[in-house]
Amino acid sequence: MSFDFYNELSRGCQAMGIELDRPGQERLYTYFVELKKWSQKVNLIAKGTGEAEIVENHFLDSLALLPLLPEGAGLLDIGTGAGLPGLICKAARPDLRLFLVEPRAKRVSFLRHIVRTLQLEGVEIYCSRIEDEPELFASEDISYITSRAVSDISGFLAMTEGFKSPHIRRLCLKGPRWQEELAEADEVLAAGNYQREKVVEYLLPFSGAERAIVVLR
């Protein structure tokens, strides 16, 4: 029996309370097809990842950010890899302004291919490390910063300490250890005068895996 991407995505979004219009679903399907194709030659996701796993662990987990992002929000995704979570969110919601930072050239080629293929506007891609892009620190277009599977909370805060605006929110995508990570980051949080605004806990709809988005300001 062939895999039904649309059914899997729709069921997952419904379970998580995420609304997607039909054009958004179609863009994500194209993304899904291209991700599978490119992953045969470029290290984008773990080898052997099944189609249902791609939808749940990568697409749905990334889309969990959407309810936290107001219309037209400027999102910076550091170490985005295959575009997770930033470009997935942009494919679903083209109104977002997106900044992607990824140091590996082959992955950047994939990101640019997706942006061209989906005809997305308002995306800036940097083949670099965040510490080598000081102009981003002063950007008034960035209101949210995120990163997925790159570092713990302490490392993420250290990585983004150049962003001084009190209006910027940091969205930390975490697993079941989020409370431990937050406790370990106590000194860094205090030194930077960061406040925990809220924590959104959720379960991935098919595996039941525990996830959380820690929002820091």
From Swiss-Prot:
It is found in: Cytoplasm. The keyword Transferase applies. S-adenosyl-L-methionine binds at G79, L84, I130, E131, R148. It is an enzyme of class 2 (transferase). Belongs to the methyltransferase superfamily. RNA methyltransferase RsmG family. One of its GO terms (cellular component) is cytosol. InterPro entries: rRNA_ssu_MeTfrase_G, SAM-dependent_MTases_sf. This is Ribosomal RNA small subunit methyltransferase G. PANTHER family: S-ADENOSYL-L-METHIONINE-DEPENDENT METHYLTRANSFERASES SUPERFAMILY PROTEIN (PTHR31760:SF0). Pfam families: GidB. Specifically methylates the N7 position of guanine in position 527 of 16S rRNA. Its main location: cytoplasm. Coiled coil: none annotated. The gene is rsmG. It catalyses: guanosine(527) in 16S rRNA + S-adenosyl-L-methionine = N(7)-methylguanosine(527) in 16S rRNA + S-adenosyl-L-homocysteine.
